[in-house]
Swiss-Prot record:
Pfam families: Fer4_16, QueG_DUF1730. Binds 2 [4Fe-4S] clusters per monomer. One of its GO terms (cellular component) is cytoplasm. Its EC number is 1.17.99.6. This is Epoxyqueuosine reductase. Its cofactor is cob(II)alamin; [4Fe-4S] cluster. InterPro entries: 4Fe4S_Fe-S-bd, 4Fe4S_Fe_S_CS, QueG, QueG_DUF1730.
């Protein structure tokens, strides 16, 4: 956990980077990324003075089988929906704050509002935004779910984290679709994670379909090759993030024919519910072709 003060010039550099990214069309069809509130936190809470940023480790030491008959699901979605897990914890923290501060005004988010989570986490000292666009912690690598409490309390800020990617370019070199177009800049139009999770089209672009390498839900390539993850990843103590049965090594043939009923049963409390049955079938079928 860390704290970032909200200043009058509040995160101007991050807002400018976001504007440039959107102007280049790198958000693909994720129109919500252009919400003006994302560039000014006082649009979310006019009285905002501090952001309490939190990170929750979700790494589990389980490994995929490597069998080409199996699909690959990103680690973040192996277990229980992180929105539910972390929101419950933030709600408890916010309730405690309300008990300490009678006039508390606050909003809390877990990937649920127009807030630049990684930028605020960096300012709060949790880590730095790496060349692959993920927040990297010296203690846990990039296997962190992020959340924030925006509040009207004036709190002592933590030291913003410096950047420690150095000259490393492993993530850029490993991406099969060259989605990391330059250090720290990801073009969603080329990103496997974007297309398998957010793209609602009936058919994936050829450049994506030809390079899926088994991925059906997200993609961890740029994280798996990161030296910080290889050296410092630690098993989480949150049992909710242990893989559900069928999420670690799902059979491509099964996913290619998944029904609405099967989808409802398998992904009841999973972040994978964002990927509808038709999308899962599409992703699996593209891997089988």
């Amino acid at each position: 956990m860390g704290i970032a003060p909200v200043s009058e010039t509040e995160n101007d550099e991050a807002a400018q980077r976001l504007q440039s990214w959107i102007a280049l069309g790198y958000n693909a069809d994720m129109a919500w990324m252009a919400n003006p509130k994302r560039q000014n936190i006082r649009e979310l809470l006019p009285s905002a003075r501090s952001v309490i940023a939190v990170g929750l480790n979700y790494y589990t030491p389980h490994q995929r089988s490597g069998d080409p008959a199996h699909g690959k699901i990103s680690r973040y979605a192996w277990g229980r929906d992180y929105h539910r897990v972390l929101t419950k914890k933030l709600k408890a923290l916010n309730l405690w704050l309300e008990q300490q501060v009678p006039d508390l005004q606050s909003r809390y988010y877990v990937d649920t509002g127009p807030i630049q989570e990684k930028a605020w986490a960096e300012r709060a000292g949790l880590g730095w935004v790496g060349k692959n666009g993920n927040l990297i912690s010296r203690d846990y690598g990039s296997w962190l779910f992020l959340g924030e409490i925006v509040t009207n309390i004036t709190l002592q800020g933590d030291r913003p984290h410096s950047q420690h990617c150095g000259t490393c370019t492993r993530c850029l070199e490993a991406c099969p679709t060259q989605a990391i177009v330059e250090p720290f800049v990801v073009d969603s139009n080329k990103c496997i994670a974007y297309h398998t999770i957010e793209n609602r089209a009936e058919i994936l672009p050829t450049a994506i379909a030809d390079n899926l390498q088994g991925w059906v839900a997200g993609c961890d390539i740029c994280q798996d090759v990161c030296p910080w993850n290889q050296r410092f990843a630690q098993p989480t103590d949150v049992a909710d993030f242990d893989p559900y049965e069928g999420n670690l090594n799902p059979e491509l043939e099964t996913l290619a024919n998944i029904t609405e009923a099967d989808w409802q049963q398998q992904f009841t409390a999973s972040a994978l519910r964002r990927i509808k049955p038709a999308m899962l079938r599409r992703n699996a079928q593209a891997n089988l072709q």
